Amino acid sequence: MKRSVLTIILFFSCQFWHAFASSVLAIDYGTEWTKAALIKPGIPLEIVLTKDTRRKEQSAVAFKGNERIFGVDASNLATRFPAHSIRNVKELLDTAGLESVLVQKYQSSYPAIQLVENEETTSGISFVISDEENYSLEEIIAMTMEHYISLAEEMAHEKITDLVLTVPPHFNELQRSILLEAARILNKHVLALIDDNVAVAIEYSLSRSFSTDPTYNIIYDSGSGSTSATVISFDTVEGSSLGKKQNITRIRALASGFTLKLSGNEINRKLIGFMKNSFYQKHGIDLSHNHRALARLEKEALRVKHILSANSEAIASIEELADGIDFRLKITRSVLESLCKDMEDAAVEPINKALKKANLTFSEINSIILFGGASRIPFIQSTLADYVSSDKISKNVNADEASVKGAAFYGASLTKSFRVKPLIVQDIINYPYLLSLGTSEYIVALPDSTPYGMQHNVTIHNVSTIGKHPSFPLSNNGELIGEFTLSNITDVEKVCACSNKNIQISFSSDRTKGILVPLSAIMTCEHGELSSKHKLGDRVKSLFGSHDESGLRNNESYPIGFTYKKYGEMSDNALRLASAKLERRLQIDKSKAAHDNALNELETLLYRAQAMVDDDEFLEFANPEETKILKNDSVESYDWLIEYGSQSPTSEVTDRYKKLDDTLKSISFRFDQAKQFNTSLENFKNALERAESLLTNFDVPDYPLNVYDEKDVKRVNSLRGTSYKKLGNQYYNDTQWLKDNLDSHLSHTLSEDPLIKVEELEEKAKRLQELTYEYLRRSLQQPKLKAKKGASSSSTAESKVEDETFTNDIEPTTALNSTSTQETEKSRASVTQRPSSLQQEIDDSDEL
């Protein structure tokens, strides 16, 4: 098999690779918890945080009227509305309708949740939310994915289309297909389905180097839904990446084992049963059909389990569990371990299965790397330590995040968006695919532990007994997954004119998803002699083999047409309907969020308005109508908000907000203007006075032409005169503007909008200061000295001064302060009394 070099990021940040780079989102959809990791070009890998900044979210969706709730809040809602809190649905992925054993087990744990048949989906089941509303298993999973995608898009500031999904190693094709269809409902592209344990191995390898001799480790994943173990081989091989030869780390999954007997949920069920029996023994009340009480016991069992992972005892306490009776029970770690005594064998069962399939012994295993939330439970760790010795137990990966991080790195390697370090990753299928030839006869289409992408050939003998258009059912882990049909056998038989005919079919699996892929079907003819007409050139060309000139063909092969139909796959129409249903639900969520946001903003504004009503100084700037709105309408709107706000249209909420907000803004504008006006006016007058001082003392220096260059003297005087005129015109216009408007402004009432605004004063003062500074620069500029006869051209060039550029570090205030105190005092007389004489001087400056 030709191996492709897959690449994993080791850099502290991702490197931009091409112009159309896109983000990759890895989702670890777990039975109890979901995690997600985002890789975007230009930023390092990040765990996607929830709305509450948690690094993981419960895999739950709840419905409360038109409201859809996710995560911990959705799980907590089960104590009030147990029928509408959908959780732990990953346990149902291997179902084939309501008769499935898994469905029966699920409904015994969550009796309030109602399930119905759904023939349009792979899973075959839907959750009933109301008489008018139900959602398929695929749609429920898609909702959680969509929730995390929206969180990731907020982080990435862009749309996300590429996903990588983790799957337990024991997931068969049916379970994988359900996850893929959930992503298809969202119109997302799944780059890969990666084994949880292989993803952990990738994360484990990033900070380590390996020799050329294989090192064998076991990734042991004990989660909420199952416990699995995968034997992983780590070594270094020679290879090339980006055209360069280098040593490359290789990660190969060799074999896996699993059990459903040991999991976080199974331990929860033990605790729930123990607490339920304790309550019955003490009070004689059976809680088996009390849905709310069972949901509360479930929540408390989860809390107690977490406490006992770190402490020797915990107190289970639930107020008014049933019939007004409080429940309180002390549970020790030893009690929990006695409840789980029958799980000890299950703890090591996956390891034994994996080692047996890999043909390895414990002595060849370097370490057992623990992963998964349940791996923290002390009795699981102690059981493993007793079985394989404690020195081989390794806890050096993040038990919650290693899988999703490894999956994100793997996804980055499958795109062109990232510059990455090379790594060879080889995943395997964990159940054989069987091709049924009859009621009791079958052949292995793909053996167990076959690496992804590897081809496997099967041969069907006795061609004459299979018919003209034979169909062969295909199964994986006991579940029928599809039908393989040969189409043109009769035509091929005419070409293959020999007595010993066989049919060879080639199968493989998708290189990144582990899904079965039929490759080809051929008819072989061993030592057959062709009829004369097929010696001429019209014969069907063979795919393999060779021929000789005598007309005999050894191992001749002829292609056969085939079709492969997957069972239970959602039709395009069903996918469109599911996508439309989720889009409608998303729009309802957005409308609800917009409504809630409008209510919150109105409530905040009402509190502010009510505070302003008691501020007499603030109310001086309100006119009678505005005062009425503040005092009356704000109170009325508050009462309306409490009584009718949640049921009212969003438009009515925003209208009330706008009316009150506009009123407050108008009053606040006048209030702020009045507070800042005197300071701004004083600054403006000071700018006028400085300008007047410079303009009043304007003179034209006498530059002797026997000393200075005559042409440059004219240039300097012209620049100075132009600057003087610009400053003078600005001064004259601003002085006149202030004279025309100041009295009117000062006579307006506080409840009227000001005639002169603070922003105008500040802008005019700024412009005056800029022109004053420019004039000072021109005043300090000197003409060139007259060149001496015989002076070198280089000295003349060195003395050249740029026409429009004069570099001087003098600040405007420094230059202005250099004006004599006497001149400054003269200029402080009335600012509005001199413009006429100054204007005449400004006009005269044109003659300079």
From Swiss-Prot:
Q: Which Pfam families match?
A: HSP70
Q: Which residues form the signal peptide?
A: 1-21
Q: Which PROSITE patterns did the record assign?
A: ER_TARGET, HSP70_2, HSP70_3
What's this chain's function? Chaperone required for protein translocation and folding in the endoplasmic reticulum.
> What is the organism lineage in this UniProt record?
Eukaryota, Fungi, Dikarya, Ascomycota, Taphrinomycotina
Q: State the protein's name.
A: Heat shock protein 70 homolog lhs1
Places the protein is found: Endoplasmic reticulum lumen
- The EC number on file is 3.6.1.-
Keywords per UniProt: ATP-binding, Chaperone, Endoplasmic reticulum, Glycoprotein, Hydrolase, Nucleotide-binding, Signal
Question: Which reaction equations make up its catalytic activity?
Answer: ATP + H2O = ADP + phosphate + H(+)
Chain positions carrying an annotated carbohydrate: N134, N247, N359, N457, N462, N488, N555, N632, N678, N733, N817
